[in-house]
């Protein structure tokens, strides 16, 4: 016995072999016949996979499968088991820890699926950056599916509940069989030619891999990728994945989930509407305050009421008309939008909410109009008062009381000594002026 090699216990040896099997050998696919199938109450499944010359023990643990998965598999059935090798240390038996089971013959389909998936991924068809954003509130929704399947009923009922005002266009197509891929492609092309939809739902109900195989077609995948309209896939159940799911702009777990993904909720729309009304009211208040500041600024800049009062009156009247007109147009525009929502939402009868909003908007118009006119009248009254005050202290008002302003060579005289006998002086009266000659000077 060589002294160079360490002496291992059985446990150590089995542990090393187990580590090698689990870490060095990756996922394997093994085809064989089921025998000695055991289904204990723990939920785990144990069986032997064999061919004509060899066999291997297999373990399919509960957390790897659904409870109903192996009900369709029995002793003597040919399957393909996918999993990783391990070692049961207590008995030194190596085994296959199964992760997935399919019927024999299905392995070819999975291989084709993986090859196409890798090919399209390398071309960038699955990249998130090339995927289009879904519209927030689509007016028209296109549905590509069988018109007689369960999927279309699930989609229509969900759309009717969540967003009944949306228009629906159904592009009928087979979703299973040899003709299905080309029909699905034609439906996608037709929807893009019409350009009437803001989003498309590509859907069908659940089924086996053969049932869903039409959605693994390469030509269909490329058509989804070049679609100008965002495509939402809702194919099969949550655990089903197709090539179309990877290429679609959004993958939903089921047809119902796809309908939910493309629609807002009516309650959310009402919240948006309430927010818009609040912002409208706030914008009008800011507009009024801004115009008030502008008017105050103009008033402060008045230099001579006699020269500018007429212009300011006209400006004030013009601003009043412009403000009322702009406010009325703004409110009427939103009333028109409210009327449009009222028409589309008749199916859900939100009439009371809409009428209440209309009344609030009309009251807002009347209230703001009245407040603006009151403020304008106050400003007019203030201007009139200021004008009267300025006139009262004006030198011209003194002339009205019988006084005169005497000037010589356009310079006002304050004392008799500023003039000489023979000078010509101007005497300005309240009405008119006199040119007088000085004949006598008195102290």
From Swiss-Prot:
Gene3D superfamilies: Nucleic acid-binding proteins. One of its GO terms (cellular component) is cytoplasm. It is an enzyme of class 3 (hydrolase). It is found in: Cytoplasm. Keywords: Cytoplasm, Exonuclease, Hydrolase, Nuclease. GO terms for biological process: DNA catabolic process. GO terms for molecular function: exodeoxyribonuclease VII activity; nucleic acid binding. InterPro entries: Exonuc_VII_L (IPR003753), Exonuc_VII_lsu_C (IPR020579), NA-bd_OB-fold (IPR012340), OB-fold_nuc-bd_dom (IPR025824). Pfam families: Exonuc_VII_L (PF02601), tRNA_anti_2 (PF13742). Its EC number is 3.1.11.6. It catalyses: Exonucleolytic cleavage in either 5'- to 3'- or 3'- to 5'-direction to yield nucleoside 5'-phosphates. Belongs to the XseA family. Heterooligomer composed of large and small subunits. Bidirectionally degrades single-stranded DNA into large acid-insoluble oligonucleotides, which are then degraded further into small acid-soluble oligonucleotides. This is Exodeoxyribonuclease 7 large subunit. It comes from Legionella pneumophila (strain Lens).
């Amino acid at each position: 016995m060589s002294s160079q090699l360490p002496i291992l216990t059985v446990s150590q040896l089995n542990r090393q072999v187990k580590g090698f099997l689990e870490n060095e050998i990756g996922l394997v696919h093994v085809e064989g016949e089921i025998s000695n199938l055991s289904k204990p109450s723990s939920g785990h499944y144990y069986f032997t996979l064999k061919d004509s010359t060899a066999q291997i023990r297999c373990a399919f643990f509960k957390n790897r499968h659904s409870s109903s998965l192996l009900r369709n598999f029995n002793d003597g059935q040919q399957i393909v088991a996918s999993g990783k090798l391990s070692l049961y240390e207590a008995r030194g038996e190596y085994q296959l820890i199964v992760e997935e089971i399919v019927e024999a013959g299905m392995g070819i389909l999975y291989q084709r699926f993986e090859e196409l998936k890798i090919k399209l991924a390398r071309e960038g068809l699955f990249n998130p950056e090339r995927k289009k954003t879904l519209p927030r509130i689509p007016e028209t929704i296109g549905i590509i599916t069988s018109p007689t399947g369960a999927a279309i009923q699930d989609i229509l009922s969900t759309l009717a509940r969540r967003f009944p005002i949306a228009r629906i266009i159904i592009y009928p197509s087979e979703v299973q069989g040899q003709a299905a891929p080309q029909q699905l492609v034609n439906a996608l092309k037709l929807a893009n030619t019409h350009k009437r939809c803001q989003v498309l739902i590509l859907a069908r109900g659940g089924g086996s891999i053969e049932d869903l195989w039409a959605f693994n077609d390469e030509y269909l995948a490329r058509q989804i990728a070049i679609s100008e309209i965002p495509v939402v896939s809702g194919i099969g159940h949550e655990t089903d994945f197709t090539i179309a799911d990877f290429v679609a702009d959004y993958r939903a777990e089921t047809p119902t989930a796809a309908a939910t993904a493309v629609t807002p909720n009516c309650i959310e729309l009402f919240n948006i509407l309430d927010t818009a009304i609040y912002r409208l009211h706030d914008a009008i208040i800011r507009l009024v305050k801004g115009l008030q500041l502008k008017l105050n600024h103009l008033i402060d800049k008045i230099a001579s009421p006699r020269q500018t009062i007429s212009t300011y009156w006209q400006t004030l009247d013009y601003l009043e008309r412009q403000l009322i007109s702009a406010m009325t147009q703004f409110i009427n525009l939103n009333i028109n939008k409210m009327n449009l929502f009222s028409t589309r939402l008749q199916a859900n009868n939100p009439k009371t909410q809409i009428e209440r909003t209309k009344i609030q908007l009309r009251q807002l118009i009347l209230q703001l109009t009245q407040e603006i006119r009151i403020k304008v009248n106050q400003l007019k009254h203030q201007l009139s008062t200021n004008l009267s005050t300025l006139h009262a202290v004006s030198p011209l008002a003194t002339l009205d009381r019988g006084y005169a302003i005497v000037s010589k060579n356009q310079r006002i005289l304050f004392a008799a000594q500023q003039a000489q006998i023979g000078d010509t002086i101007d005497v300005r009266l309240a009405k008119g002026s006199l040119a007088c000659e000085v004949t006598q000077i008195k102290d």
